[in-house]
């Protein structure tokens, strides 16, 4: 199976320019290709993972990746299929975000080994030097307004209004492709399906200005079995930065994937061979309640993004929380596992009597309710049932001197911090 056939079989190809010519190019020898990442935040998120995975697949097949961070385009904002114009960020903010994204990409793509080691480029290095007049003369003249207006991403914004700044974005991205083609012999761009218009602006510029052929592969927008855009957890983006989305949260995200999506996502998001995935499918369909596919999916993705140690920690947190073994976890692990539960910062003058504290922390509404819950055995401190109405929280209840976990009933967790 060729690399292109592999990408298609995994569901990683949505659209391409001349497919036969592209396949021949990939089969004939090493291809230099690039993917661009605009710094729109201080971290990449799950939506960026699919093009990253395609980059890695192509690199493993011997092709040479260029990771472009948009130090210039990030100052402008891509209008593609956005309802409103992006807020412009300061140069300092974009510069900091560029550095964060560079650091993240270095975890996923090999920048150190072999003749196809990846290279990082920043489009501010050439965009920052070209004058406005030169840009209009040497780049702008190759694009007709009719051609630019025909792009679906622009059409959708014309009625509501689009600034010239955003209208010109496709030319900037096209110029990126042209520069990389001239300076690094890059002949292929990989990106999201929403980038088709911007990416083909690059192939058009290379054709008209350099009389060369270049190619584009877009990856699909990933949706779940219900058609909902995939990559958010309870409305929040799943980030690739452990400080924004912990490895435990990411592990839980993949563990909760619907049965109907699990095998498809194994093909898209992991490097397991298609034969291995077929074996998993057979076992999974025989006993879906065991959630084998989801467990393997969670393991593979969390390990790829955060490493083996983070994966093992996520499994430990999951198992110990499920068993109620709070004291077997460190404060750091509990912060991951209970990051979304209500918490209360205990003040130095708070009464540490359990009845008083349950009310003060907002765990129950009244002292009467607190006493009833305690007497009924519904209150647990760090996994241990407390029924003594006179119990006072003390130093021994502080895990790593940082927090105490209170559980009310079977599933309602609360965290007290000090």
From Swiss-Prot:
Q: What residue stretches are annotated with the S4 RNA-binding domain?
A: 352-418
Native organism: Streptococcus mutans serotype c (strain ATCC 700610 / UA159)
Where is the chain membrane-spanning?
none
Location comes to: Cytoplasm
Gene3D superfamilies (UniProt xref): HUPs, RNA-binding S4 domain, Tyrosyl-Transfer RNA Synthetase
The GO terms this record gives for MF are:
ATP binding; RNA binding; tyrosine-tRNA ligase activity
Q: What is this protein called?
A: Tyrosine--tRNA ligase
Q: Where does ATP bind?
A: 232
């Amino acid at each position: 199976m060729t690399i292109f056939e592999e990408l298609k079989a995994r569901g990683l190809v949505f659209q391409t320019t001349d497919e036969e010519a592209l396949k021949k190019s990939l089969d004939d020898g090493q291809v230099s290709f690039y993917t661009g990442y605009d710094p729109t935040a201080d971290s990449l998120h799950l939506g960026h993972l699919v093009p990253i995975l395609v980059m890695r697949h192509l690199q493993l097949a011997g092709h040479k990746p260029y990771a472009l961070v948009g130090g210039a385009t990030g100052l402008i904002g891509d209008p593609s299929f956005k309802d409103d114009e992006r807020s412009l960020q300061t140069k300092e903010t974009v510069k900091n975000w560029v550095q964060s994204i560079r650091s993240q990409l270095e975890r996923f793509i090999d920048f150190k080994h072999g003749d196809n080691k990846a290279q990082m480029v920043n489009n501010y290095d050439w965009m920052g030097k070209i004058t406005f007049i030169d840009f209009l003369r040497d780049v702008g003249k190759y694009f007709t307004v009719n051609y630019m207006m025909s792009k679906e991403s622009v059409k959708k914004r014309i009625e509501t209004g689009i600034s010239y700044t955003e209208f010109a974005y496709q030319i900037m991205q096209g110029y990126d492709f042209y520069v990389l083609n001239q300076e690094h012999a890059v002949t292929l761009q990989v990106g999201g399906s929403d980038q088709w218009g911007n990416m083909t602006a690059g192939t058009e510029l290379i054709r008209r200005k350099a009389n060369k052929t270049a190619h584009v592969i877009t990856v699909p927008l990933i949706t779940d079995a219900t058609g909902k855009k995939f990559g958010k957890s309870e409305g929040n983006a799943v980030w690739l930065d452990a400080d924004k989305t912990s490895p435990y949260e990411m592990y839980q995200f993949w563990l909760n994937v619907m049965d109907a999506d699990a095998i498809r996502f194994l093909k898209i998001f992991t490097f397991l061979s298609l034969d291995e995935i077929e074996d998993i499918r057979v076992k999974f369909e025989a006993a879906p309640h065991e959630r084998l596919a989801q467990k393997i999916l969670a393991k593979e993705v969390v390990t790829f993004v955060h490493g083996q140690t983070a994966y093992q920690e996520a499994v430990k947190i999951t198992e110990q929380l499920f068993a109620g073994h709070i004291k077997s976890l460190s404060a750091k692990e509990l912060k991951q596992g209970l990051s979304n539960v209500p918490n209360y910062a205990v003040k130095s003058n708070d009464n540490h009597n359990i009845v008083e504290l349950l009310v003060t922390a907002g765990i129950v509404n009244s002292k009467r309710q607190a006493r009833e819950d305690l007497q009924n055995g519904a209150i647990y401190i760090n996994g241990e049932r407390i029924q003594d109405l006179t119990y006072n929280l003390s130093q021994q209840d502080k895990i790593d001197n940082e927090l105490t976990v209170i559980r009310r009933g079977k599933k309602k967790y609360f965290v007290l911090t000090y």
